[in-house]
């Protein structure tokens, strides 16, 4: 299992606009939305971060979804609006080595 984290460092005070654009993109199926995906925001640390956390069984599955997303009709137009709210971004790809919790 791999966890892909798309981390967006937003411009100060632009969280609400960015969240509205994310909601719009999800409604219009412009973004990757594998089962058990999460949208996170900071509670501590550097402020104005928006994090998309995407679980994938394989990196090949992630690459296939990413290719599909980038070719989605309307994605480029949406992204042009979204990136105006972003100061910087980064991507983390993590390998899950064990699952913790009651249901393991």
Show where each model-derived region lies.
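A compositional/biophysical signature of low hydrophobicity enriched in polar/charged and small residues
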Residues: 10, 85, 98-99
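An amphipathic, aromatic/His-enriched active-site/gating alpha helix that lines ligand/cofactor pockets
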Residues: 20, 24-38, 43, 55-93
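Short acidic/glycine-enriched loop/turn segments that link adjacent beta-strands
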Residues: 45-48
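Short, low-order "capping/linker" segments at domain edges
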Residues: 92-104
């Amino acid at each position: 299992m791999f966890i892909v984290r798309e981390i967006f460092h937003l411009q100060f005070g632009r969280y609400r606009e960015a969240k509205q654009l994310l909601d719009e993109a999800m409604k219009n199926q412009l973004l990757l939305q594998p089962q058990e995906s999460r949208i996170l925001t900071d509670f501590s640390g550097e402020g104005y971060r928006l994090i998309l956390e995407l679980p994938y069984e394989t990196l090949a599955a992630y690459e296939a979804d990413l290719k599909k997303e980038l070719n989605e009709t309307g994605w480029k137009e949406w992204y042009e609006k979204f990136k105006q709210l972003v100061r910087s971004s980064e991507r983390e790809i993590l390998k899950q080595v064990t699952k913790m919790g009651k249901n393991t």
